[in-house]
Curated annotation (Swiss-Prot):
Keywords: Heme, Iron, Metal-binding, Monooxygenase, Oxidoreductase. It comes from the Eukaryota. This is Cytochrome P450 77A1. PROSITE patterns: CYTOCHROME_P450. GO terms for molecular function: heme binding; iron ion binding; monooxygenase activity; oxidoreductase activity, acting on paired donors, with incorporation or reduction of molecular oxygen. It holds the Pfam family p450. It comes from Solanum melongena (Eggplant). Heme binds at C443. Its cofactor is heme. The lineage of its organism: Eukaryota, Viridiplantae, Streptophyta, Embryophyta, Tracheophyta.
Length: 499
């Protein structure tokens, strides 16, 4: 019945949307699909997560293949060599973004953000501002005090959580709070002592991510005539609440900038300070409040989920591997003694850095990079890559490729210490793993994220010994996609205070 309905539905859509024939590009191979809807219903009816569907196609179709997802043509790049060719060797051509669906256009203010902007003057201006004026090593040092406060809050929250729940804690919830605390301070220049307010802002940001989830009419736009009214209404409600929540924080910071010394508790600098008068090529005025909301949301969302979920996976792996956890703890004790780990210490900890690198290899934040598109028609592996095609780089597949890694399913930090294997996560010379993307669209917050993960993991291991809950060292590593790749069942852990 499902197949018959799908075929009839495909015919209906075909009659509505058929266009004159044009020269057919030589696309990479892929599974045969139905007219108009392509492989959309095959993916939806497979019972698999999208990354599992892609992973299972790779043995048959190789390292580059095509899916037709309704009106979208999606080209999957699933090898390290082709990722390097596209994003490094042909980086300028592959540096753009495809058209957005209407929901994303609303939240990106028509692509006015670092991640969403097409390759051009808006992207150059916004990215240059973020990298040079906010995420440079010297700027990051200015927020060290906020990171230290957040680390202490993290440890205290875990202590309280453990005391109230027979030594059992939620790993993600506490880590996420600490990361969000840091990013709110960096973005708005305020130290939020009101934990309820922080959690309210955080929940609002989660709601934004939820409404950004793809819908059937994103792939078949003709369906917007018939479905999606309630979802579109929900989108507008969430956007309205997003603006109402963040604009007061924006205006408060604007007042501080315009009246120096008026707020003794305000930070000397914030991301917003760089945005009020940012010069964007081709524009005479600075960003509107709605655009500032978009840029601030990008900063908060981009840094919170990737870091917090990495820590949850990291704690899970240490619980599964007590020997690795103990070796990490001994390194911490050797380097810092009884004092608290700080940012200078983590640079002297090769095993910590190996653990985090292996964590990012085994559990990259997303299955795919943010979608790329090309600025002009180009060939890759002998196939045509047309403009306005969605090019998806299979991050998870690359970091688990047995042709690149020995025993890729094993969590093994020693692979980075023995000289047996190594990888530059920027991918400049060679791509072996790309947790933050590579090339011109590499995540601008890479340096900040690695500092946060290293520091927080070190503090959590220094203060507590972590055990699986319930016991026997069994950890459920089932996963699902919620903007980032998270544990399907949020991690609960039993902790024992060390000091």
């Amino acid at each position: 019945i499902f197949t018959a309905f799908s075929l009839l539905f495909s015919l209906f859509i075909f009659l509505l949307t058929r266009k004159p024939k044009s020269k057919t590009p030589n696309l990479p191979p892929g599974p045969p699909g139905w007219p108009i809807v392509g492989n959309l219903f095959q993916v939806a009816g497979s019972g698999k997560q999208f990354f599992e569907y892609i992973r299972d196609l790779k043995p048959k179709y190789g390292s580059i293949f095509t899916l037709k997802m309704g009106s979208r043509t999606m080209i999957i790049v699933a090898s390290a060599e082709l990722a390097h060719e596209a994003l490094i060797q042909k980086g300028q051509i592959f540096a753009s973004r495809p058209r957005e669906n209407p929901t994303r256009t609303i939240f990106s203010c028509n692509k006015f953000s670092v991640n969403a902007a097409v390759y051009g003057p808006v992207w150059r201006s916004l990215r240059r501002n973020m990298v040079q004026n906010m995420l440079s090593p010297s700027r990051l040092k200015e927020f060290r005090e906020f990171r230290e406060i957040a680390m202490d809050k993290l440890i205290e929250r875990i202590r309280v959580d453990a005391k109230e729940n027979n030594d059992v804690v939620w790993a993600l919830k506490n880590a996420r709070f600490a990361v969000f605390y840091i990013l709110v301070a960096m973005c708005f220049g305020v130290e939020m002592d009101n934990e309820e307010m922080i959690e309210r802002v955080d929940q609002m940001m989660k709601d934004v991510l939820i409404v950004l989830d793809p819908r059937i009419d994103d792939f078949l736009p003709i369906l917007r005539l018939f479905v999606g009214y309630k979802q579109r209404k929900r989108v507008n409600e969430v956007r309205k609440r997003q603006i109402e929540t963040l604009v007061p924080l924006i205006e408060k910071r604007r007042s501080v900038v315009q009246n120096p010394g008026s707020d003794k508790t305000a930070a000397s600098f914030s991301y917003l300070d760089t945005l009020f008068d940012v010069k964007v090529e081709g524009r005479k005025s600075g960003p509107t409040n709605a655009e500032l909301v978009t840029l601030c949301s990008e900063f908060l969302n981009g840094g919170t989920d990737t870091t917090a979920t990495a820590l949850e996976w990291g704690i899970g792996r240490l619980m599964e591997n007590p020997t690795i956890q103990n070796q990490l703890y001994q390194e911490i004790k050797t380097i810092v003694g009884d004092k608290k780990v700080d940012e200078n210490d983590i640079e002297k900890m090769p095993y910590l850095n190996a653990v985090v690198k292996e964590l990012l290899r085994k559990h990259p934040p997303t299955y795919f990079t943010l979608t790329h598109s090309v600025t002009e028609p180009v060939k890759l592996a002998g196939y045509d890559i047309p403009m306005d095609t969605n090019v998806e780089f299979f991050v998870h597949g690359i970091s688990h490729d047995p042709n690149v890694w020995s025993d890729p399913e094993k969590f093994d930090p020693d692979r980075f210490l023995s000289g047996r294997e190594d990888a530059d996560i920027t991918g400049v010379k060679e791509v072996k793993m790309m947790p933050f993307g590579v090339g011109r669209r590499i995540c601008p917050g890479l340096g900040m994220a690695t500092v946060h993960v290293n520091l927080m993991l070190a503090r959590m291991v220094q203060e507590f010994e972590w055990f699986a809950y319930p016991g026997n060292n069994k950890v459920d590593f089932s996963e699902k996609l919620e903007f980032t790749v998270v544990m399907k069942n949020p991690l609960r852990a039993k902790v024992k205070l060390r000091i």
